Amino acid sequence: MKLWVGLGNPEPGMARNRHNIGFMAIDVIADRHGFAPWRKRFSGLVSEGSVGGEKIVALKPLTYMNESGRAVQPASAFFKLPPDAVTVFHDELDLIPGKVRVKRGGGAAGHNGLRSIDRTLGTQDYWRVRLGIGHPGDKARVHGHVLGNFAKTDEDWLVDTLEAVSDAAPLLAAGKPEDFMTKVALLTKDTA
């Protein structure tokens, strides 16, 4: 069993924010892989299903981004999961839009959702699926960028990326992050 967490903010008006791409990815995975209906649990929304034969618990924290760990920690403790069974899908400023990278461990790089999870799990040794949203170029514009909505011109690459992540998800569930990244890249090569 694995816990896959999509990061985002729960306000309906923030649903299309760049910061919510983690929620979007988990929603597409749960939908396309036939997960059970979402229900409230662990200060979040939870859905269970199977990806590539692996049982997955999907979690969308309703704690707001900066307190995501308040949902992740109790969920991982309840299911008795070690940190390396947790995968967090999140927005990544340092990747161009549509680029996807997976890594285990590492710092929060200024991402408050990751910082909260690091603090509550007591470790950084969990998996991250970094979903590129691009950098606005000026550090002073970062806050407005991540909390801004995706533009209509982003729609093609965004939909293609989210569908590719879902289509490649069985490789991620099987513990093959390199193969997952390769498949996502191949599926999005004309749009990212």
Curated annotation (Swiss-Prot):
Superkingdom of the source species: Bacteria
The entry's localization annotation reads:
Cytoplasm
Active-site residues (renumbered): H19
Q: Where is this site: Discriminates between blocked and unblocked aminoacyl-tRNA?
A: N9
- Site (Stabilizes the basic form of H active site to accept a proton) at D91
- Pfam families linked to this entry: Pept_tRNA_hydro
Q: Residues that bind tRNA, according to the entry?
A: Y64, N66, N112
Q: What is its EC number?
A: 3.1.1.29
Q: Which reaction does it catalyse?
A: an N-acyl-L-alpha-aminoacyl-tRNA + H2O = an N-acyl-L-amino acid + a tRNA + H(+)
**Which molecular-function annotations from GO does this UniProt entry contain?**
peptidyl-tRNA hydrolase activity; tRNA binding
Supply the alphabetized keyword list: Cytoplasm, Hydrolase, RNA-binding, tRNA-binding
Q: Spell out the GO cellular component terms annotated for this protein, sorted alphabetically and separated by semicolons.
A: cytoplasm
Report the SS bond pairs: none
Family to which this protein belongs: Belongs to the PTH family.
Q: What does this protein do?
A: Hydrolyzes ribosome-free peptidyl-tRNAs (with 1 or more amino acids incorporated), which drop off the ribosome during protein synthesis, or as a result of ribosome stalling.
Identify the NCBIfam families for this entry: pth
| PANTHER family the UniProt entry points to | PEPTIDYL-TRNA HYDROLASE
Identify this protein by name. Answer: Peptidyl-tRNA hydrolase
